[in-house]
Regions:
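Alpha-to-beta junction loops
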Residues: 53-56, 72-86, 168, 185-187
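Sec/Tat signal peptide C-region and signal peptidase I cleavage site
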Residues: 16-22
């Protein structure tokens, strides 16, 4: 993911390399200021700025600093933000395919498998079609940024499907939430930045 993020940011910057003045892009993230993802993005943004002699800069804004996390694609489409570094499963309410592309629980063994699908198996093009179905011609997909598998943490023992009944679970929207709901759980989609405070 590290190499890919730099590549995606450089691709985004190719449009601006001939510009006489610096271009500063504002990307809203799904993480709070200071957490690992926000820090990571800041480090990569500095590398990008150095590689372009300061002609292209990216400011990673913390979650909800401009718009709520589920409204970032509208903000990009309307020119309020220049980019979005967010979990696309949050947009599953608009098109269920966002859930499949954004958080296919147990669909891949590693983030690298998903990255390979995105870059070499048609995934990036599929994701572009999904965005175009919601906001035609307003969003350009530069790539995918998969996360590794997350743990299912619970205050009560879960030894099988029956133990999920009545348990409140953090889950992405769409397919995953539907599976948990059918198993009797109460799925809730909350941003990662709010996990420890919920």
């Amino acid at each position: 993911m590290k190499k890919y993020l730099i590549s995606a940011l450089i691709v985004a910057g190719l449009t601006f390399t001939g510009a006489a003045s610096a271009k500063k892009l504002k990307f809203q993230m799904s993480s709070k200021a200071g957490d690992w993802a926000h820090t990571y993005m800041g480090e990569k943004a500095k590398i990008l700025s150095d590689l372009t002699d300061g002609k292209l800069q990216i400011e990673g804004l913390p979650t909800k600093s401009v718009v709520p996390h589920r409204e970032t694609i509208d903000a990009v489409a309307n020119g309020i933000l220049d980019g979005d570094f967010n979990a696309i499963a949050y947009f599953a309410g608009r098109d269920p395919a966002f859930a499949i592309m954004g958080d296919l629980i147990a669909g891949y063994d590693t983030p690298k498998q998903y990255q390979e699908y995105c870059m070499h198996g048609g995934g990036k093009e599929m994701l572009q079609k999904i965005y175009d179905s919601v906001l035609p011609g307003k969003i350009l997909v530069l790539g995918c940024g998969p996360y590794g598998k997350e743990a299912l943490v619970s205050k009560v023992p879960i030894n099988g499907v029956a133990d999920l009944k009545g348990v409140k679970i953090r889950s992405p929207e769409g397919l995953a939430a539907d599976v948990f709901r059918r198993a009797g759980a109460s799925p809730s989609s909350i941003p990662f930045s709010e996990v420890y405070t919920s």
